[in-house]
Amino acid sequence: VSRRRRRWWIAGAAVAVLLTAAVVVTAIAFPSVAATTCPGCYGLERLEPGVYAEPGLPQDRRRQVSEVVQQANKRVRDFFGGRKSSPDLLVCLSDDCYRRIGGGRERGIAVLNRAVMLSPRGVDPVIASHEMTHVELHARLNGADVPQWFDEGLAVLVSDDPRYLAPTGDRCLLDSRQPLPVTLAEWLRAASADPQMYAKAACQVSRWAGANGGKEGVRTLVGRLSAGQPFPDVFHPPAAPA
């Protein structure tokens, strides 16, 4: 009996060591994943449910973060007619904070489609709602695939980003009849070489939405994708207006 217990103890200890090693490797290799799992471990404090920021922020900066989150949530909720996701937000108002949690030069990023990190340059409703849209879309897709250009173009549309969309009418600032990047790796390469890739993607999505019932049409499209219909069967690029 004692020998059997010893074997179980050794096995349990080995599992504990392996799990600890996995946590350490994740924290070193993927700090953003670790930070979104344990914001407090990276020096962030909870400002409100689901929102974390640097400790000791003055009241006006805390209020700024809260207002940005509220406005961004409203944009996503209004577009989709509700929410199916509730990502944690890690908000940094200093570059040191953003580097510490694994951020780079981006304004913001959705981490594993379950959390959002915002850099000091991304603490505004446009960037926050852009990243929240990625999380919301994938929560509604239930594992269905969409081209990365659609994912990004929809995020621009929902966030109403004036850098890449006109305010009214045919909202395209930059049309492109060329194929757009399909995979995430292709998108990252293309967008780093051409920042206007976002405008090209947003043009396609906004024109499709304009020709297919707007927000309701997009919600219907996402529902059909979630039900298993392939993307090429439900999304047909509209012609440019005459």
Feature-to-residue mapping (PLM):
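Acidic/histidine-rich, surface-exposed loop or edge segments in extracytoplasmic proteins
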Residues: L44-R62, N113-A115
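Sequence contexts marking disulfide-bonded cysteines in secreted/extracellular proteins
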Residues: T37-Y42, L93-Y98, R171-L173
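Structural motif
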Residues: L57, L93, S119-R121
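Beta/coil-rich, acidic/histidine-enriched accessory regions frequently appended to metallopeptidases
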Residues: V1-A35, C41-L44, Y52-G56, E67-Q71, ...
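Short pre-active-site segment immediately N-terminal to the catalytic Zn-binding motif
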Residues: L112-S129, R140-V146
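Auxiliary, metal-adjacent structural segments of Zn-dependent hydrolase domains
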Residues: R61-N113
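Short active-site segment of divalent metal-dependent hydrolases/proteases
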Residues: T133, L137
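Acidic/His/Gly-enriched intrinsically disordered linker/tail segments
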Residues: I127, L141-A242
